[in-house]
């Protein structure tokens, strides 16, 4: 009964938000927004079974897509075949992620989508333009110490969520899988199209990046410019990327912060920016790090770095523009998120070769 009530409540919320979401030319069809009742999280164990028809032996990237070698039959002396995935193969991966998002609702607010976006963001946001290190190429968050960095707390949920997908499509690298999953989540939660291309290679533990390359939510605008500037972003791009806070919520057992940024944490909209501009925010009185709560309902939260976006003149003009123009936010977020996912990746393909995946129906 309680589960049905929660589902009805979420359906009503999404219904009320739908005009704003669908007003954009990038918007998701109505049936794509699926939210069910929340249950306790449980991770799935990866299968240890081996196949006697397909034994993967290695990976060699060629061109814009990967050429993947495997043994037919699984026996010594068996013939070696080469599989070069096409757009249709990557669409199948997208479809599998989208289906799992629709069926696995035992996470915050009924969707793993926001944490998949965070995984793609954090896997990519370690890039350093000066040294050419970090970025999505490598998926080194699979290993300690990077997996144990404070900014990556809680991302095991996202990595575990994708393990069954990796098992089903063993030819895709973790680097490509994590970024494709982020693109899929944004599209399936009503956001803009995220053009994507393969070509990332996985690395071992030696490729782990040092701690401190990701944003610290307790800081101010100077920190934002230092972190994002290291990756090569300008003020407009910085504000657009932080717009990923349209999705998800903070957790006391991870970042130390608590609560969602807006009333629709599983629907991608420009509400984050509208609330920054239109709502009054005050420091929350609680036994935790400094964060801000909305004056109206006292159920939402903002980081100090979020409030810095409206306190800094250079940032605020972009916040106000996105708050007024959802289409502009969707378009510019898509462009800069694609840029983020590709930082430091030695592609052999052209930008014209990017795929735009068909959304689920």
Swiss-Prot record:
What is this protein's name? Cytochrome c peroxidase, mitochondrial
* Tree of life domain: Eukaryota
Annotated site (Transition state stabilizer): 118
Q: Does the keyword Nucleotide-binding apply?
A: no
- Record organism: Emericella nidulans (strain FGSC A4 / ATCC 38163 / CBS 112.46 / NRRL 194 / M139) (Aspergillus nidulans)
* Main localization, broad class: mitochondrion
The transit peptide is at: 1-41
List the gene name: ccp1
Q: Which GO terms describe its biological process?
A: cellular response to oxidative stress; hydrogen peroxide catabolic process; response to reactive oxygen species
